[in-house]
Amino acid sequence: MSKWIHTFFKNISQVVLLENAWTGLLILIALWIGNWKIGLAAMIGSVISLLTARFFNYTDEEIHSGLAGFNPVLIAIDLTLFLLWSWQSILVILISIVLAMPIAQAIKNLLKPFRLPELTTPFVIITWVVLLMSQQFKFVKTNVDVLPLTADVHVNLNTTFHPIHAFFSDVSQIFLIEHTISGILIVIACFIASRRAGIYLLIANFLGLLLEFFFGADIGTLNEGLFGFNLMLSIIAIGVTFRSANHLKAAIAFILTVVMTPMMYAATATFLEPIGIPSLTFPFIITTWTLLLAGQSTAHPDIAK
Protein backbone atom coordinates (compact mmCIF):
# COMPACT_ATOMS: atom_id res chain seq x y z
CA MET A 1 0.00 0.00 0.00
CA SER A 2 1.21 3.50 -0.77
CA LYS A 3 1.91 6.00 1.99
CA TRP A 4 -1.41 7.78 1.42
CA ILE A 5 -3.40 4.56 1.55
CA HIS A 6 -1.58 3.69 4.77
CA THR A 7 -2.54 7.10 6.14
CA PHE A 8 -6.16 6.65 5.06
CA PHE A 9 -6.45 3.52 7.21
CA LYS A 10 -4.34 4.89 10.08
CA ASN A 11 -6.82 7.77 10.38
CA ILE A 12 -9.32 5.08 11.33
CA SER A 13 -7.03 2.96 13.52
CA GLN A 14 -6.03 6.01 15.56
CA VAL A 15 -9.61 6.26 16.81
CA VAL A 16 -8.59 3.35 19.07
CA LEU A 17 -5.19 5.02 19.68
CA LEU A 18 -3.28 2.49 17.58
CA GLU A 19 -1.17 3.23 14.51
CA ASN A 20 -1.56 0.35 12.09
CA ALA A 21 -2.95 0.41 8.55
CA TRP A 22 -4.17 -3.20 8.67
CA THR A 23 -5.97 -2.45 11.92
CA GLY A 24 -7.67 0.47 10.20
CA LEU A 25 -8.67 -1.71 7.25
CA LEU A 26 -10.24 -4.38 9.44
CA ILE A 27 -12.04 -1.76 11.52
CA LEU A 28 -13.43 -0.22 8.33
CA ILE A 29 -14.74 -3.64 7.28
CA ALA A 30 -16.34 -3.96 10.72
CA LEU A 31 -18.03 -0.59 10.27
CA TRP A 32 -19.48 -1.52 6.89
CA ILE A 33 -20.81 -4.77 8.38
CA GLY A 34 -22.40 -2.93 11.31
CA ASN A 35 -23.85 0.00 9.36
CA TRP A 36 -22.90 0.97 5.82
CA LYS A 37 -23.62 4.64 6.56
CA ILE A 38 -20.99 4.60 9.31
CA GLY A 39 -18.50 2.85 7.04
CA LEU A 40 -19.04 5.43 4.30
CA ALA A 41 -18.88 8.33 6.77
CA ALA A 42 -15.57 7.05 8.17
CA MET A 43 -14.10 6.93 4.66
CA ILE A 44 -15.29 10.46 3.87
CA GLY A 45 -13.87 11.82 7.12
CA SER A 46 -10.54 10.14 6.47
CA VAL A 47 -10.31 11.42 2.89
CA ILE A 48 -11.18 15.01 3.84
CA SER A 49 -8.54 15.05 6.56
CA LEU A 50 -6.00 13.65 4.09
CA LEU A 51 -6.71 16.46 1.66
CA THR A 52 -6.78 19.32 4.16
CA ALA A 53 -4.56 18.47 7.15
CA ARG A 54 -1.48 20.11 5.62
CA PHE A 55 -3.24 23.49 5.82
CA PHE A 56 -3.65 23.26 9.60
CA ASN A 57 -0.08 23.14 10.86
CA TYR A 58 0.27 19.36 10.94
CA THR A 59 3.67 17.87 10.18
CA ASP A 60 4.01 15.15 7.55
CA GLU A 61 4.82 12.71 10.35
CA GLU A 62 1.62 13.58 12.21
CA ILE A 63 -0.46 13.32 9.05
CA HIS A 64 0.96 9.97 7.96
CA SER A 65 0.64 8.48 11.44
CA GLY A 66 -3.10 9.25 11.42
CA LEU A 67 -3.03 11.86 14.16
CA ALA A 68 -4.72 14.50 12.01
CA GLY A 69 -7.51 12.21 10.87
CA PHE A 70 -9.06 10.32 13.76
CA ASN A 71 -11.19 13.19 15.08
CA PRO A 72 -12.55 13.98 11.58
CA VAL A 73 -13.42 10.29 11.19
CA LEU A 74 -15.36 10.25 14.46
CA ILE A 75 -17.13 13.52 13.67
CA ALA A 76 -18.18 12.27 10.24
CA ILE A 77 -19.61 9.14 11.85
CA ASP A 78 -21.59 10.66 14.69
CA LEU A 79 -23.00 13.66 12.82
CA THR A 80 -24.11 11.33 10.03
CA LEU A 81 -26.12 9.46 12.65
CA PHE A 82 -27.32 12.43 14.71
CA LEU A 83 -28.37 14.91 11.99
CA LEU A 84 -31.51 14.48 9.92
CA TRP A 85 -30.98 14.42 6.16
CA SER A 86 -30.86 17.79 4.42
CA TRP A 87 -28.40 19.65 2.23
CA GLN A 88 -27.81 22.02 5.13
CA SER A 89 -26.93 19.09 7.40
CA ILE A 90 -24.47 17.75 4.83
CA LEU A 91 -22.77 21.13 4.72
CA VAL A 92 -22.61 21.22 8.54
CA ILE A 93 -20.99 17.77 8.56
CA LEU A 94 -18.36 18.78 6.00
CA ILE A 95 -17.58 22.01 7.85
CA SER A 96 -17.33 20.13 11.15
CA ILE A 97 -14.92 17.57 9.69
CA VAL A 98 -12.58 20.34 8.57
CA LEU A 99 -12.97 22.32 11.81
CA ALA A 100 -11.82 19.29 13.80
CA MET A 101 -8.22 19.85 12.70
CA PRO A 102 -7.62 23.51 13.67
CA ILE A 103 -9.56 22.93 16.89
CA ALA A 104 -7.39 19.89 17.63
CA GLN A 105 -4.26 21.98 17.08
CA ALA A 106 -5.56 24.70 19.37
CA ILE A 107 -6.35 22.20 22.12
CA LYS A 108 -2.99 20.48 21.65
CA ASN A 109 -1.15 23.78 22.13
CA LEU A 110 -3.35 24.63 25.12
CA LEU A 111 -2.49 21.32 26.78
CA LYS A 112 1.26 21.39 26.09
CA PRO A 113 2.16 22.92 29.49
CA PHE A 114 0.30 20.04 31.14
CA ARG A 115 1.93 17.44 28.86
CA LEU A 116 -1.43 15.97 27.92
CA PRO A 117 -2.71 14.71 24.54
CA GLU A 118 -5.86 16.22 23.06
CA LEU A 119 -7.36 12.76 22.50
CA THR A 120 -10.95 13.02 21.18
CA THR A 121 -11.68 16.42 22.74
CA PRO A 122 -12.30 18.10 19.33
CA PHE A 123 -14.81 15.37 18.48
CA VAL A 124 -16.72 15.91 21.73
CA ILE A 125 -16.69 19.72 21.53
CA ILE A 126 -17.75 19.92 17.88
CA THR A 127 -20.52 17.35 18.31
CA TRP A 128 -21.93 19.14 21.33
CA VAL A 129 -21.76 22.48 19.50
CA VAL A 130 -23.59 21.12 16.46
CA LEU A 131 -26.30 19.42 18.53
CA LEU A 132 -26.90 22.52 20.63
CA MET A 133 -26.80 24.96 17.71
CA SER A 134 -29.38 22.87 15.83
CA GLN A 135 -32.02 24.33 18.15
CA GLN A 136 -31.40 27.76 16.60
CA PHE A 137 -31.49 26.74 12.91
CA LYS A 138 -34.68 25.64 11.17
CA PHE A 139 -32.95 23.58 8.49
CA VAL A 140 -30.38 21.82 10.69
CA LYS A 141 -32.31 19.19 12.61
CA THR A 142 -31.17 16.35 14.84
CA ASN A 143 -32.74 13.12 16.06
CA VAL A 144 -31.28 13.80 19.52
CA ASP A 145 -33.79 15.16 22.04
CA VAL A 146 -31.83 18.28 22.94
CA LEU A 147 -33.16 20.29 25.91
CA PRO A 148 -35.96 17.87 26.83
CA LEU A 149 -38.85 19.25 28.88
CA THR A 150 -38.23 16.62 31.54
CA ALA A 151 -35.15 14.65 32.51
CA ASP A 152 -35.70 11.20 33.98
CA VAL A 153 -32.97 8.65 34.62
CA HIS A 154 -34.66 5.24 34.76
CA VAL A 155 -32.69 2.13 35.70
CA ASN A 156 -34.32 -1.14 34.60
CA LEU A 157 -32.88 -4.36 36.03
CA ASN A 158 -35.65 -6.61 34.70
CA THR A 159 -34.49 -6.64 31.07
CA THR A 160 -32.74 -9.81 29.91
CA PHE A 161 -28.98 -9.41 30.00
CA HIS A 162 -27.11 -10.59 26.89
CA PRO A 163 -23.47 -10.80 28.05
CA ILE A 164 -21.85 -11.77 24.73
CA HIS A 165 -23.66 -9.06 22.80
CA ALA A 166 -22.95 -6.53 25.55
CA PHE A 167 -19.27 -7.54 25.65
CA PHE A 168 -18.62 -6.93 21.98
CA SER A 169 -20.99 -3.97 21.71
CA ASP A 170 -18.78 -2.29 24.32
CA VAL A 171 -16.09 -2.38 21.63
CA SER A 172 -18.19 -1.58 18.57
CA GLN A 173 -19.80 1.43 20.30
CA ILE A 174 -16.44 3.21 20.03
CA PHE A 175 -17.69 3.85 16.49
CA LEU A 176 -21.35 4.29 17.54
CA ILE A 177 -22.35 0.80 16.39
CA GLU A 178 -24.21 -1.82 18.42
CA HIS A 179 -23.12 -4.99 16.63
CA THR A 180 -21.56 -8.22 17.90
CA ILE A 181 -19.68 -9.16 14.73
CA SER A 182 -18.32 -5.63 14.34
CA GLY A 183 -17.09 -5.75 17.93
CA ILE A 184 -15.33 -9.07 17.35
CA LEU A 185 -13.57 -7.71 14.26
CA ILE A 186 -12.46 -4.56 16.10
CA VAL A 187 -10.99 -6.69 18.90
CA ILE A 188 -9.07 -8.70 16.30
CA ALA A 189 -7.94 -5.44 14.69
CA CYS A 190 -6.54 -4.29 18.03
CA PHE A 191 -4.65 -7.56 18.42
CA ILE A 192 -3.09 -6.98 14.98
CA ALA A 193 -1.65 -3.65 16.11
CA SER A 194 -0.74 -4.68 19.66
CA ARG A 195 -1.16 -7.97 21.48
CA ARG A 196 -1.10 -6.04 24.75
CA ALA A 197 -3.95 -3.81 23.52
CA GLY A 198 -6.07 -6.83 22.61
CA ILE A 199 -5.46 -8.61 25.92
CA TYR A 200 -6.07 -5.47 27.98
CA LEU A 201 -9.24 -4.83 26.01
CA LEU A 202 -10.65 -8.27 26.80
CA ILE A 203 -9.73 -8.29 30.49
CA ALA A 204 -10.86 -4.71 31.15
CA ASN A 205 -14.11 -5.29 29.29
CA PHE A 206 -14.90 -8.38 31.35
CA LEU A 207 -14.07 -6.68 34.65
CA GLY A 208 -15.93 -3.52 33.65
CA LEU A 209 -19.10 -5.46 32.84
CA LEU A 210 -18.89 -7.30 36.18
CA LEU A 211 -18.49 -4.03 38.06
CA GLU A 212 -21.32 -2.29 36.21
CA PHE A 213 -23.64 -5.28 36.70
CA PHE A 214 -22.72 -5.49 40.40
CA PHE A 215 -23.50 -1.80 40.89
CA GLY A 216 -26.90 -2.26 39.24
CA ALA A 217 -26.44 -0.48 35.92
CA ASP A 218 -29.41 -0.33 33.56
CA ILE A 219 -29.44 -3.65 31.70
CA GLY A 220 -30.56 -2.11 28.43
CA THR A 221 -27.64 0.31 28.55
CA LEU A 222 -25.27 -2.58 29.27
CA ASN A 223 -26.67 -4.60 26.36
CA GLU A 224 -26.20 -1.66 24.00
CA GLY A 225 -22.55 -1.26 25.00
CA LEU A 226 -22.99 2.33 26.12
CA PHE A 227 -21.43 1.76 29.54
CA GLY A 228 -18.29 0.13 28.22
CA PHE A 229 -16.90 1.83 25.13
CA ASN A 230 -15.19 4.61 27.06
CA LEU A 231 -13.38 1.98 29.13
CA MET A 232 -12.10 0.35 25.93
CA LEU A 233 -10.47 3.61 24.90
CA SER A 234 -9.16 4.42 28.38
CA ILE A 235 -7.48 1.06 28.86
CA ILE A 236 -5.68 1.29 25.51
CA ALA A 237 -4.59 4.85 26.25
CA ILE A 238 -3.30 4.15 29.76
CA GLY A 239 -2.11 0.58 29.26
CA VAL A 240 -0.62 0.81 25.77
CA THR A 241 -0.37 4.11 23.89
CA PHE A 242 0.87 6.32 26.76
CA ARG A 243 2.22 3.51 28.92
CA SER A 244 5.83 4.69 28.77
CA ALA A 245 4.85 8.20 29.89
CA ASN A 246 2.88 7.01 32.91
CA HIS A 247 4.88 6.24 36.04
CA LEU A 248 2.06 4.62 37.97
CA LYS A 249 2.52 0.90 38.54
CA ALA A 250 0.96 -0.94 35.60
CA ALA A 251 -1.41 -2.98 37.77
CA ILE A 252 -2.53 0.09 39.72
CA ALA A 253 -3.10 2.09 36.53
CA PHE A 254 -5.10 -0.81 35.08
CA ILE A 255 -7.34 -1.14 38.14
CA LEU A 256 -7.88 2.61 38.41
CA THR A 257 -8.87 2.77 34.74
CA VAL A 258 -11.36 -0.08 35.09
CA VAL A 259 -12.95 1.50 38.16
CA MET A 260 -12.85 5.18 37.18
CA THR A 261 -14.13 5.04 33.62
CA PRO A 262 -17.59 3.54 34.34
CA MET A 263 -17.97 5.94 37.27
CA MET A 264 -17.13 8.88 35.01
CA TYR A 265 -19.57 7.65 32.37
CA ALA A 266 -22.41 7.29 34.89
CA ALA A 267 -21.78 10.74 36.36
CA THR A 268 -21.43 12.40 32.96
CA ALA A 269 -24.57 10.73 31.57
CA THR A 270 -26.57 11.96 34.57
CA PHE A 271 -25.11 15.46 34.40
CA LEU A 272 -25.93 15.82 30.69
CA GLU A 273 -29.39 14.24 30.88
CA PRO A 274 -31.23 17.57 31.41
CA ILE A 275 -29.42 19.05 28.41
CA GLY A 276 -30.17 16.03 26.25
CA ILE A 277 -26.74 15.61 24.67
CA PRO A 278 -24.74 12.35 24.78
CA SER A 279 -21.59 11.99 26.88
CA LEU A 280 -19.69 10.58 23.88
CA THR A 281 -16.02 9.98 24.81
CA PHE A 282 -15.86 12.64 27.52
CA PRO A 283 -15.52 10.04 30.34
CA PHE A 284 -12.55 8.53 28.50
CA ILE A 285 -10.92 11.95 28.19
CA ILE A 286 -11.35 12.82 31.88
CA THR A 287 -10.15 9.41 33.08
CA THR A 288 -7.12 9.39 30.80
CA TRP A 289 -6.08 12.95 31.62
CA THR A 290 -6.47 12.27 35.35
CA LEU A 291 -4.32 9.15 35.32
CA LEU A 292 -1.69 10.68 33.03
CA LEU A 293 -1.39 13.66 35.35
CA ALA A 294 -1.25 11.35 38.37
CA GLY A 295 1.53 9.34 36.75
CA GLN A 296 3.68 12.18 35.43
CA SER A 297 7.33 12.22 36.43
CA THR A 298 9.34 15.34 37.21
CA ALA A 299 11.45 14.82 34.09
CA HIS A 300 8.82 16.60 31.92
CA PRO A 301 8.70 14.24 28.92
CA ASP A 302 6.54 15.47 26.08
CA ILE A 303 3.70 13.00 25.58
CA ALA A 304 1.37 15.34 23.75
CA LYS A 305 -0.01 13.56 20.74
Regions found by a protein language model. Name each.
Residues 30, 41-49, 53, 57, ...:
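Alpha-helical transmembrane segments in multi-pass membrane proteins
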Residues 31-44, 83-96, 167-179, 219-230:
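Structural signature of hydrophobic alpha-helical transmembrane segments
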Residues 34-39, 55-67, 85-90, 106-117, ...:
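Membrane-helix interface "capping/anchor" motifs
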Residues 59-74, 115-117, 198-199, 203, ...:
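Short, non-helical or kinked segments that cap or interrupt transmembrane helices
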Residues 118-179:
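Long hydrophobic alpha-helical segments that form multi-pass transmembrane helix bundles
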Residues 217-226, 234-249:
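Hydrophobic alpha-helical bundle architecture
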